[in-house]
Amino acid sequence: MPRLLATQSHVVHGYVGNKAATFPLQCLGWDVDCCNSVQFSNHTGYGLDKVFGTITRETDLKELLSGLFDNFSQDYQALLSGYLPNKNSVRCMGTYYAKFKEANPEMIWLMDPVMGDEGQLYVSEDVIPEYRKLALSPKQLVDIITPNQFELEILYGGEIKTKEHLKKALKKLHQTIPVIIVTSCDCKMFDDKDFIYCVASMEGKTPIVYRVPFIDSYFTGVGDLFSALLLDRVYKILSNPTTTLKFEDQVNNVLNVIQKVLKITRSYASGKMKAKMGSALEMKEMELRLIESRDIYETINIHQTDYIYARL
């Protein structure tokens, strides 16, 4: 059974961060160890005045990761990092994840550089240099990143307004990162606002554009679930040189699973409710139904829709 260390947020109620990643990965046969970067009552979509809890101090995070490295440096097959609240926590995570990678170069690290979306930062600007150091490290520590377009622009260091800009950004980051999944791209770059566009790129191969129907509601934890499922699928490819699994098919499968989870979640909501930020009642209704979706995480368990749209 493969083992994974995940460092990201934790909520007591609901499903984001480690709460969104752990159960699906366990269903897929992973032994998951969670290191929580924050511990909140619920996610921030309920409204900032309805979130209670604490940020894990750098000294505490360091002590936890240090202990895990000293005791289990050879025990993990994969590393996952998601939301980290400040530059010190990013730096601390990066320092220890680098040690894990140096101790076991076969370990796969997926980094979700959570910084913001649609031109707005969720974190302080001093987090940016820390993520850029990790993404652009000549040591090539990170194997997979899952930024949205805004986060990709930050890592790349320039605006992305055309497909050519996108290809240049991917080419630059592929100098240090083998697998890049841009989880959402500006629909203006393509042709239809009724769809979400995702771009998957593996070093040395033509980037693939996926087009997924837009579900008109606000969900939280989707990116965390996506990263967890993607890590599982890519691990199955990279850890088995004789595999017949194809990268583009595995990404397509993850998108199918995500769509199915969102539809299941929507089906439990009252009437035609669609959640929006700051509405506690609506957010409660739209918490991801991960337990109800437990039978669909495996590739073979759901009907596959081909979301491949184009190649860059």
Curated annotation (Swiss-Prot):
Per the record, a Pfam family?
A: Phos_pyr_kin
- What cofactor(s) does the depicted protein rely on? a divalent metal cation
**InterPro entries reported in the protein's UniProt record:** PM/HMP-P_kinase-1, PyrdxlKinase, Ribokinase-like
* MF annotations from Gene Ontology: ATP binding; metal ion binding; pyridoxal kinase activity
Query: What does it catalyze?
Result: pyridoxal + ATP = pyridoxal 5'-phosphate + ADP + H(+)
Q: What is its EC number?
A: 2.7.1.35
A biological process term (GO) from this entry: pyridoxal 5'-phosphate salvage
Predominant subcellular localization, coarse grouping: cytoplasm
Q: Which residues bind ATP?
A: 183-184, 211-223
Instruction: Give the subcellular location.
Output: Cytoplasm; Nucleus
Cellular component per GO, a single term: cytosol
Q: Which family does it belong to?
A: Belongs to the pyridoxine kinase family.
Tell me which PANTHER family the record gives: PYRIDOXAL KINASE
What is this protein's record name? Putative pyridoxal kinase BUD16
- Native organism: Saccharomyces cerevisiae (strain ATCC 204508 / S288c)
Name the gene.
BUD16
